[in-house]
Structures are given as structure tokens and as C-alpha cells.
């Protein structure tokens, strides 16, 4: 018996990411596999609870994602985990629990208790043996595992685990029986700026976390792309690349580095947040400026010049959010490291002027209240 193959074409935040291909265990759980296949095919009719909504995954989202656990989808009626329907009726029974949750990238039915299967399902990110005997495994991912990891690593709402950017199933369908997974299917695609690294270091086949040189190459390659885009005034892309480098640094903490290697990493922990801060300033993302600049001030390798830059950029952020007291505090502190810096001195002058205007405005408001 040939196992059928279906696909999801995924976008994140409106940006296409590629295709996930599933192989369905129709030889083990034929009814459950058929349900999923028909929902991918999209021609099984309309939902009973919402007659204007087709029984199809197309256009629905991954509404619940928990890192190191699973990515859940399939609520095409309510988009929040409370809806969805099977092709048989709203719910159908647990077919069997033959296949165990013993590895990542398995496809398993979500439910609200025994015999409540509908259209919602999830992809495992790790082995989840505590789900054995409770959820029906009916397939696995055979292509697009890097996309599953990308979904897994999305920032999510802390209350409901919904990705902050929509992870959408733009299209879905059934593939020919003779479909073969391309040899380079899991290779990281190179984006239009030349970046071919995954968002997570440990998930990139080009990177060996035990090999310092491969880690450093990843960080410096992406950093250089960010700098190139900054020079072209493409600040949003530059910021994206610098933030990616920052994530690389924060997930890399080996214990056996040589002194010279430690110094290189520590220098990057200064230069990259400084770059994030200046990009964020250009984009008026002042909250990010405050966070990145503060990281520099706590960095072990930050010298006087770096501290002056961090205080200056943080001071400007405070200025733009109208906290002139904090702005002056930072800017004047910056002069202790760079006393003759014209940009810092100009910022101090502007901040004092702004504070004076704020005080005058406050006095006028008070006088009106008591007049």
C-alpha cells in the first residue's frame, strides 16, 4: 500500500517560507489519514457549524506553538483552538494508538478528550511519550523540517501560545503517489541579501556548535550582511540581521573556548547590540534602543568608547520618548568617556532646551488649573 503525501505551503507574517510535506499512515490509521487528506484536498464540502466555511486547512493558521513541544493547527472555523470539524461530522473516534510519540516531526491528532477528533492536529518538535495512548499519530513530516523549526521558534503570546506573527497555511493539497523528496529539500535557502543561515544555530547543518570557527563564521557572515544593508540605508533589514546575530550569541555558551576566542565573542557582544541600537534609532523603535544600549553597558568587553556610544544612543531614545531627565543623565554620563564629542554635546543642549519647554508647559497647565 502506498502512503499518500500531502503538503502545506507556509507563510509567516505574510512572507512565504516554503512547503511542508507529510506522509500519512493510511496503512495503520486509514480513517484518520483520510480525514487529513480530504482536509488538505479541500473538496469535502462545507463546515456544519459555519456553512460558509469550506472543510479545508487552506487559509487557516498555526494557532498554538510551544517550543520544545509541538506546533498545533487545524481550527479553520474559529482560528483559536475552539473550532474545526472532521469530514465525518464534527468529531470522530480514536482509531488506535499503535504509533508512539517517540520522535520529532510526527503528525498527531489534537483532541478535547477520548474520541473527540476533529480537524485540529499538531506536529511534534521532540519525543512526547506522555501523549501516548491519548492522541492518535497518523503521519510524519518528510520535507520542510526546517520550516517546522522556524514555526517552533516564533515569538508567541505568553497567555495563549499563539504566534505574534500569523503562521498561515497559504495553500494545501495532495501530491502524486510517486512524489520524491528532493535531495536538497532541507538546505537553508539563501535570501535576497545572501544570508543562508537558519534562525537557530543548532538547527543549521553548516554549523557545528563544538567548532568555534563555524559559529564565528555564521555570526560574522550575517553581521556583515547587516552592515552592508545599513550602508544602503535599508535599516529594517540591517536590524533583522543584527538581531539574528544577537540570538546566535545568546544561544552559544561553550565552556572550553581559548582566551582569544572568548575575546572575539565578547567583542561581538558589544558591537552587535550597538548596531542594533543605531538601527532601532533610525527606525524609531526606542524600546529596542533602550534594551540594546543597556546590554552594552553591562558587557564585559565594553571600553570607554563603546560605553559612550551606548549612553549616547540610549540618551537619544529617552529624549524621543520625552524622558528628558533620564536622557540628560545618560548624555552627561557619556561625556565622562568622550568629553569633547560634538554630537553628545549637541544632544545635551537639545535635551536641556526640551526640558525647559516641558517645564514651561507644565507651569502653564498648573496656572490654568488654579486660575
UniProtKB/Swiss-Prot annotation:
Ranges where the PPIase cyclophilin-type domain occurs: 7-174
Please name the GO terms of the biological process aspect recorded for this protein, alphabetically: protein folding; protein refolding
Report the InterPro entries cross-referenced here.
Answer: Cyclophilin-like_dom_sf, Cyclophilin-type_PPIase_CS, Cyclophilin-type_PPIase_dom, TPR-like_helical_dom_sf, TPR_rpt
EC numbers, comma separated: 5.2.1.8
Keyword annotations for this protein, in alphabetical order, are: Cytoplasm, Isomerase, Repeat, Rotamase, TPR repeat
Q: Would you say which domain of life the source belongs to?
A: Eukaryota
Top EC group: isomerase
Where it mainly occurs, coarsely classed, is cytoplasm
Record's GO cellular component terms:
cytoplasm; intracellular membrane-bounded organelle
Q: One Pfam match, by short name?
A: Pro_isomerase
- Compartment(s) of residence: Cytoplasm
What GO terms are given for molecular function?
cyclosporin A binding; peptidyl-prolyl cis-trans isomerase activity; ribosome binding; unfolded protein binding
Spans of TPR repeats, please give: 219-252, 270-303, 308-341
So what does this thing catalyse? [protein]-peptidylproline (omega=180) = [protein]-peptidylproline (omega=0)
| Family of this protein | Belongs to the cyclophilin-type PPIase family. PPIase D subfamily.
Q: What else is known?
A: Present with 18600 molecules/cell in log phase SD medium.
Q: What does this protein do?
A: PPIases accelerate the folding of proteins. It catalyzes the cis-trans isomerization of proline imidic peptide bonds in oligopeptides.
Q: State how it assembles.
A: Interacts with RPD3.
Q: Could you identify this protein by its name?
A: Peptidyl-prolyl cis-trans isomerase CPR6
Q: Organism, per UniProt?
A: Saccharomyces cerevisiae (strain ATCC 204508 / S288c) (Baker's yeast)
What gene codes for this chain? CPR6
Amino acid at each position: 500500500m502506498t502512503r499518500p503525501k500531502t503538503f502545506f505551503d507556509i507563510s509567516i507574517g505574510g512572507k512565504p517560507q516554503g512547503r511542508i510535506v507529510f506522509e500519512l499512515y493510511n496503512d495503520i490509521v486509514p480513517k484518520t489519514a483520510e480525514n487529513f487528506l480530504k482536509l488538505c484536498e479541500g473538496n469535502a464540502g462545507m463546515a456544519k457549524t459555519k456553512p460558509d466555511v469550506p472543510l479545508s486547512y487552506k487559509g487557516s493558521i498555526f494557532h498554538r506553538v510551544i517550543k520544545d513541544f509541538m506546533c498545533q493547527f487545524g481550527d479553520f472555523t474559529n482560528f483559536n483552538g475552539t473550532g474545526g470539524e472532521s469530514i465525518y461530522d464534527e468529531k470522530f473516534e480514536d482509531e488506535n494508538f499503535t504509533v508512539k510519540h517517540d520522535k520529532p516531526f510526527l503528525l498527531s491528532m489534537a483532541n478535547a478528550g477520548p474520541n473527540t477528533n476533529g480537524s485540529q492536529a499538531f506536529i511534534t518538535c521532540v519525543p512526547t511519550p506522555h501523549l501516548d495512548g491519548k492522541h492518535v499519530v497518523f503521519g510524519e513530516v518528510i520535507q520542510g523540517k526546517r520550516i517546522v523549526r522556524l514555526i517552533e521558534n516564533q515569538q508567541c503570546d505568553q497567555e495563549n501560545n499563539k504566534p505574534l506573527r500569523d503562521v498561515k497555511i497559504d495553500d494545501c493539497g495532495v501530491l502524486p503517489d510517486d512524489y520524491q523528496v528532493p535531495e536538497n529539500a532541507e538546505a537553508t535557502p539563501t535570501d535576497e541579501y545572501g544570508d543562508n543561515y537558519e534562525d537557530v544555530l543548532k538547527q543549521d547543518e553548516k554549523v557545528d556548535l563544538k567548532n568555534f570557527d563555524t559559529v564565528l563564521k555564521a555570526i560574522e557572515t550575517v553581521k556583515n550582511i547587516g552592515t552592508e544593508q545599513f550602508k544602503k540605508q535599508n535599516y529594517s533589514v540591517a536590524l533583522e540581521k543584527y538581531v539574528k546575530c544577537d540570538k546566535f550569541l545568546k544561544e552559544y555558551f561553550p565552556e572550553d573556548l581559548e582566551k582569544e576566542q572568548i575575546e572575539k565573542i565578547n567583542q561581538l557582544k558589544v558591537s552587535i547590540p550597538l548596531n542594533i541600537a543605531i538601527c532601532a534609532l533610525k527606525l524609531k523603535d526606542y524600546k529596542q534602543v533602550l534594551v540594546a544600549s543597556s546590554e552594552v553597558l553591562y558587557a564585559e568587553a565594553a571600553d570607554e568608547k563603546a560605553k559612550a556610544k551606548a549612553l549616547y544612543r540610549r540618551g537619544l531614545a529617552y529624549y524621543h520618548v520625552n524622558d528628558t531627565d533620564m536622557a540628560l543623565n545618560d548624555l552627561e554620563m557619556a561625556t565622562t568617556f568622550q568629553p569633547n564629542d560634538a554630537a553628545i554635546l549637541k544632544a545635551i543642549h537639545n535635551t536641556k532646551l526640551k526640558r525647559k519647554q516641558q517645564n514651561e508647559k507644565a507651569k502653564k497647565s498648573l496656572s490654568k488649573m488654579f486660575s
